[in-house]
Every structure is written in C-alpha cells, then in structure tokens.
From Swiss-Prot:
Coiled-coil segments: 16-97
A Pfam family hit: DEAD
Name of the protein in its database record: DEAD-box ATP-dependent RNA helicase 7
Domain Helicase C-terminal: 357-500
CDD domains in alphabetical order: DEADc (cd00268), GUCT_RH7_like (cd12937), SF2_C_DEAD (cd18787)
Species assigned in the record: Oryza sativa subsp. japonica
MF annotations from Gene Ontology: ATP binding; ATP hydrolysis activity; mRNA binding; RNA helicase activity
Region annotation Disordered: where it falls in the sequence: 1-116, 641-696
Amino acid sequence: MPSLPVAAAEPMAVDESASKKSKRKLKAAEVEVEASSRKKEKKEKKRKAKEPSPSSSSSSEEEERSSTSSDEPAPAAKKAKKEKTKEKVVVEEEEEDDDEGELTASGDEDPADPNALANFRISESLREKLKSKGIKALFPIQATTFDLVLDGHDLVGRARTGQGKTLAFVLPILESLVNGTHKASRRTDYGRPPTVLVLLPTRELAKQVHTDFAFYGATFGLSACCVYGGSDYRSQEMAIRKGVDIVVGTPGRVKDFVEKGTLNFRSLKFRVLDEADEMLNMGFVDDVELILGKVEDVTKVQTLLFSATIPEWVKKLSLRFLKSGKKTVDLVGDEKLKASASVRHLALPCNRAARAQVIPDIIRCYSRGGRTIIFTETKESASDLSGLIAGSRALHGDVAQAQREVILAGFRSGKFLVLVATNVAARGLDINDVQLIIQCEPPRDVEAYIHRSGRTGRAGNTGVAVMLFEPRYKFNVNRIERESGVKFEHISAPQPTDVAQSAGTEAAEAISSVSDSVIPVFREQAEQLLNSSGMSAVDLLAKALAKAVGYTDIKKRSLLSSMDNHTTLLLQTGRSVYAAGFVLSTLKRFMPEERLADVKGITITADGTGAVFDVPSAEVEDYIQGAQNAAMVTVEEVKQLPPLQEREQSGGSRGGGRFGNRRFSGGGGGRGGGGRGFGGGRGRGGGGGNRFNKRY
C-alpha cells in the first residue's frame, strides 16, 4: 500500500471528541519517538538504555526528539529514511483507528446505539447491503423481534404500518436460511419448492415486500418471486416451476397456485402473514385459512404474524396456526395517536384517473385563496401533478438544495400558492399559514397522515385536510380512522356548479374593484348587448361572469368516483337490495343489455333499500325515463351520496368479472364464488349464475 502524506490522517480526527484527539496525538508522538530511537540503536547503546518507556509524558518525549534533531543532524539519505518510517508508522496508526472506529468514521453506525447493526447477528455482507440503503440501526420492531425469529420462535408482532415490519421478518429469515438453523437443508436445485411464503392483502404491499426480499436475498444467492392477481398468470407460474426460495403474494393468487398443484409446501420453513387485520377487512379469511392449512407438518414450519390491531379472527388464527410457545411483541399497546383538533378532516373518493381534474377544484373550493400543500407518494407523480396545476411548484428528492430553498422562499412569500411535495422532501417545513392539505392517497403510515395533516391548522389557525382514496381501497381510510382517532367527514368531489359559483364569487369581487373610468368606454357596447339579447340585466351579467371565469357550459361529475361527464344515480325497488347482480337484472327490465356495460361502481346503500351507480351523463334521462315504465322501480339523480355499505352482505370482496372488487362479488364467499347471478372467481366469471357472470 503506498504511503500517504501525514496530513491525510488529519481529517479522520475532525469529528472525534477532545479527549480522543489528545489520546491519539499522544500515542502518535510516542510511536514516532520509539521509531526514531530504534534507528539509532546501534550507534547509541547508552541512549538506548535510557530510552523513555511508553508511559513517559509527551513533554519529555518532545524534548528528547528536539534534542536528537538539533544536536545530531542526520545525512540526507538517513533523513529521507526517517521520514519514510514516520509516514509508515502514522499510516499504520491511521489504519488501526479506521478498524477501531470504522462505523463512526464512515458515518455508518454508532456503536453506542443498542439497535446498531453491529449488535445483532447480521452477517457482514448483509450489513453492507443495509448500509447502502442508509440503514445504520434497526427500528424498534426489528430490534425486538430479530433474536426471537432467528432463534426459531413463532411470533405475533404488533406494530403500526410504516414502523419497519417488513425488515423485521426479512432480515432474520435470510440469516436463518443461510447462516442459521436451516443452513444445512438449503436447496439450490431446479424446480425446488419454496422455503418461505409471505402473504399480504394487496398487490402493492406484496410488490414492496418482494423488492426487499429480492434486494437483500441476492446477497446470499436466494431467489424470490411475487404472485398476485391482475397480472400475467403464466409468467408467475413459470417462475414457481423453475424453483424459487421465497414466494410473496396475495391470498387469491397463492390459493390458485396451491389448488392447481403448482405450489407446494413440502420444504417450507417460514410462513409470514403481514397486515393480518387488513386481510380480515378485505374478506380473505377463507383463503388465508385454506393456505395455512396446506402445511402438513407444522412442527417444521416457523410462523410469523404481524398486525396493527388484533381483532378476534387474528387471535383465533394465532391460536390455531402458531405453536403454543409463540412469542408476542406489542409496540402499540393502548396508545392512540391524535390528529389536530383544529383541522377539518375530509375523505373524498377519487379514481386515480380523475385526480388531475378534481384537485384544482378542491383547491378552489377549500383553500380560501391561501396556501395549499399537495402530498404525493412518488417524485414522478409530484412532477406530473405540478405540471397540470397552474402556479404550482414540485418539491422532491431530485430537486437540488439551492433550488429547494428558492422554492420554499417563493411559497412562504406567496409568489405561488400551491406546493406539490413528497413526504420526505416536505420534512422540516415550518409554515404556519397553510390553509389546505391534500393527500393524493392514504399513506401506509398513520403517523405520516397525522404529520401531513398537521401542516395546516397551526399557530391557532384552522385548516382543512382532504385525503383522496380509490373507492375499492376504502379500507385504508378505515385503518387510519381506527389507528389515529380521526373521524373523517366523507365528501364528494366539488361539482362543477360548486366550482363555478366559487369562481363567480371571485370574478364578482374582481369586477367590483375595476375603476369607474372604464364605464364610458364600454357603456355603448353594454347597452347594445342588453337591448339585443332579450335577457334581463342580471341574466346577462351572469353569463358575462361565466365567460370571464371560463364556464361556457356546466359539466357533470360523479359523486361516487369523481369522474367527469358521469352522473351518480340512485335505484330503489321498494324491497331490499342484496347484490350488484340484482341491480343489473332490474336495470335490464327497462334498458337495453348493451347499455349496461356503461354502468359503473354499483354500491348498495347502508340501509339496503337501494343502490347507487354511475352512468355517462348523456344517458341520465334515458335511465330516469325508462324507470317510469317499470313497476316498483325509481331512478333519480342524487345530489348527495347516501350512507353506503362497506361491502355486500354476501361477504364477497373480490367478485368476478370486469367489476372485480368487493362491490360486485356474488354470494358464497370472499372471492365471488358461486353467487346468484353475479358470482365468479376474480375476473374469470367462474361460479354459478346467469348470463351476467361472464359479462360482468
């Protein structure tokens, strides 16, 4: 290794404490004198006999070194050799210090932190992978459960979403497979069955967990695949048949592969249920129990169950499928996070495709002309959305620090009033007069919701926090309510009439502020227009205001999905409505069957006496007029959504066909199997019923 200049060692000490600095300097001085003395050993035997011990004071050593250099100057060659020796000694000392304080010098770990990576049985290669992601220490749930899992215990872990539950099972499972109890039984042959199965309620969660297993598992040559509905079945099947170590997936697709015989659990060592309470909420009870029940020898399988809450089904699940000696780790307890009482919390159903049209209208109706912060989950969506909203700026991780400061200064000063930001980029914002917060989707982490919504309603002010959600993922709204204590006020997207009225009010105020000096210039044209229009002055002025704010006509907007040019209708039949199939059958009595393809989002009312659904606005009159010719049927346009059911009473949550979600599942269970007239398995229409099965 080439020698480094002595100065190269100095930066290593910049961040050291004063005491450590002194100790290091003293040690360097001692080594330096010792090396110098050794070189003169042959010529100065008497001096060698009197050579100071390593415990001598630094001042005596400095005097001795000074005397040596002044009284007996060395030749040039000897001096060069001496400098080389000094360099070598100091560099060696630097390398020693590097080894000793490696984790702090590089800014990685703090050994004083009990949760530092070095304090756990994590292999060096995996530690390096974690450091590459900026992870220096384990989160509480990870630290608390690591040894329990690695030592082979079944586990029930309770922690809020977003607290690091994924790595709480990823890390110890990987270590166990490669360096722990399962090392000897590890297989690498073609077609091998999986050793790890992880179940999650949604494809988004499954993909996130799969990403972690794939990234960290690659360190040990472990392979992982992700299986979920709505994607290519064949490619997932081939991945399993080739042989895989870890399978991550949603219950429905995993069940398919199990029943087909593609997936077997003969070599299974771990099974993990993450977000177990959400699996209950989404109707996966039967699927989960069937999958867990396929393990023949449970004594050879370690089961890990993670959940934010422990409802009765989760308790029964743990008693039935986990060993009696299971461990429980609860980081939630009875605590309940609190959102600001000065904030009005609103939840608004909105399909992803409608966001760009709906968000500007939310701003117009709820911001009161003040500042708005819009939170997105990705920097790409932040950039895209800011490009669609006039007068807005994006703030995310790709924005340079200098530009970030310019953007924040402009937002604070009011140069622009809408900031579109990712959660990470918005940390540290301290702006008291933000009137409106919009979250484009429910965050996985309830703390993130409270943190974001708390950006408004500060310093004694009141504010509004609007959270958008896709109707089929309404369970995420319930989760945040449950974990945070927030009670959402459920609203529909601002209707074009609401937005137009708001814009008209602003335009009227602007007109009132126009100087009277312009009246003579426009009076003649105004009189001509009034005389020729045949309208009253008020009506004519109303049209002028509409034109001024860009409204030449008023469009319709769905109350159910926020989609433009769609209208929400309410159907009632004078008797109970149990399923979407019944609604479609009723509509078929007075509407052509081909028109029913345009019916979207059928949802049963909370009292079970009717159902709401969307149709193209141009067809509204056809439905209303048609219902008048059908006995005991009424169809009307709704101005405000009535209370709605979470899911159909049939209990199905993933019904078949193009309407494959909880609203359209047939009777007979959680996945739309065998329902009357609208059953079918996850978009394939399997299951009994009439002609609507395959079509819808």
